[in-house]
Amino acid sequence: NETPAEDYRLAAKLGAVINLDDLTHVDFLERAIGYIPKKIGCRFNPGGTFSLGETREGFQVMDKPGDAKYGMTRAQIAEAFRLLKAKGAEEFGIHAFLASNTLSNEYYPALARMLFRLAAELQQETGCYITFIDLSGGVGIPYRPG
């Protein structure tokens, strides 16, 4: 994801919470807006496949985070949090988007368990104050023939 500098500048001007997809975006964001926001998020990608079994339609549109070009590995997000904290960030969030067309009632509880566990680990490991978890989208719609 190559977010243009002007998009980061607009987000900062609007007071939006910025989520970074890649460790290299930390320095790029700082150059683009001149500082690191006090509140910031990072996108986590656990890799592998995220599946809760077949949907009623027999598929999920996207459920292979390991193939996605977005998000940071466990090691990268820990490094990003440390770097962001050193550059002035005070509140941190974790975002993840692991599957699309999820019709199972189990998706969000499973995703929440994963992200809250990660948040607790990262807070202990990095000393960063994690104030929000973004469970993303991915809610499926009932595709039907005709």
Model-assigned labels for residue ranges:
Residues L135:
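Structured binding elements
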Residues V139-G146:
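A conserved active-site cap/scaffold subdomain adjacent to cofactor or substrate pockets
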Residues N1-F132:
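Active-site-proximal beta-alpha core segment in soluble small-molecule metabolic enzymes
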